[in-house]
Amino acid sequence: MGNDTLEKRYRKLYTSVIFQALMDLTKLNTSITDTSVSVTRGNAHAWFFTTSGQTADDFEEVCDNAGLDPVFVRDFAYSVVHEKGNKNVKKRIIRFFE
């Protein structure tokens, strides 16, 4: 962290929250009985795509604190969820934050 200002540190923190939510959103089930992955993915989906209420407010606040436009982030999340074949999704998510 060295020379990072407090603002930059917070921005990294909030960016990491979005990054993790995108990773959760694109998780694949490891077995038929693995409900924790489905629950995690469902929670991430609700966080990205709920457009009213506290969940939507939280999403927008996290995006604002990360310095990212919530509409842009939501559109990106939509695109990775609906991408055919999950092969390069993780790479797209990583590139999104570069």
Task: List the predicted regions and their residue ranges.
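Charged interaction scaffolds used for protein-protein
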Residues: 1-98
